[in-house]
């Protein structure tokens, strides 16, 4: 088989790529639901998965697909001023447009309409992102305490202070507030004030629209 098969899609509160956390795990409050495609909704396929606390997701950068690719990219963590090899970064602009994320598995729901649904936290995926594979995270082999982080070691982590008026928070679904504020304060790549403000506005606007749709 030459083509990868989409086995599932994740549903999050992030409808566009500009608000997605720069890495998985940076916003542990951000919730998502993984819904399998009809051909893969057999409950037997997830038997035993509930015994694991974390999962690996292999997915597609569906919002950043390009026909060509560049051997070097400008990582946002370096301010966009220094080029690094694409395989030395996690840039979405890769030959195969594949992403890898580690998420916490909160629970496995058995839905009559959708089959097994995985409720996860800490994902860095846009709503509707196609998933190619799901694997359990194995601490004894996947954790490397002596790992070296290359150019990311020693970089300062910046956070935004976000103040949201109570009347605005009330218009956002209660189960989405903590994750949204987590994205705005610590999940975004360091940017200029103007760009950050635009991202904040975009995220708030998108969630307000979704809040209206749920009513």
Annotate the PLM regions.
Residues 1-102, 106-215:
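Glycine-rich, low-complexity intrinsically disordered segments
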């Amino acid at each position: 088989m030459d083509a990868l098969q989409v086995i599932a899609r994740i549903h999050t509160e992030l409808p566009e790529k500009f608000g997605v956390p720069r890495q998985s795990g940076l916003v542990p409050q951000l919730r998502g639901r993984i819904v399998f495609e009809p051909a893969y909704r057999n409950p037997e396929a997830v038997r035993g998965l509930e015994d694991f606390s974390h999962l690996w997701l292999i997915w597609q950068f569906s919002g950043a697909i390009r026909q060509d690719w560049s051997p070097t990219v400008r990582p946002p963590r370096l301010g966009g001023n220094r080029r690094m090899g694409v395989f030395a970064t996690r840039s979405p602009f890769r030959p195969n447009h594949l992403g890898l994320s580690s998420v916490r598995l909160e629970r496995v729901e058995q839905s009559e309409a959708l089959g097994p649904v995985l409720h996860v936290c800490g994902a860095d995926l846009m709503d509707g992102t196609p998933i190619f594979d799901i694997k359990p995270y194995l601490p004894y082999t996947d954790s490397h305490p002596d790992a070296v982080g290359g150019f990311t070691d020693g970089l300062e982590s910046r956070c935004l202070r976000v103040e949201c008026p109570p009347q605005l928070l009330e218009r956002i679904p209660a189960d989405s507030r903590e994750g949204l504020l987590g994205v705005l304060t610590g999940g975004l790549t360091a940017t200029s004030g103007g760009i950050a403000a635009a991202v904040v506005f975009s995220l708030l606007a998108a969630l307000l629209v979704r809040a209206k749709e749920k009513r």
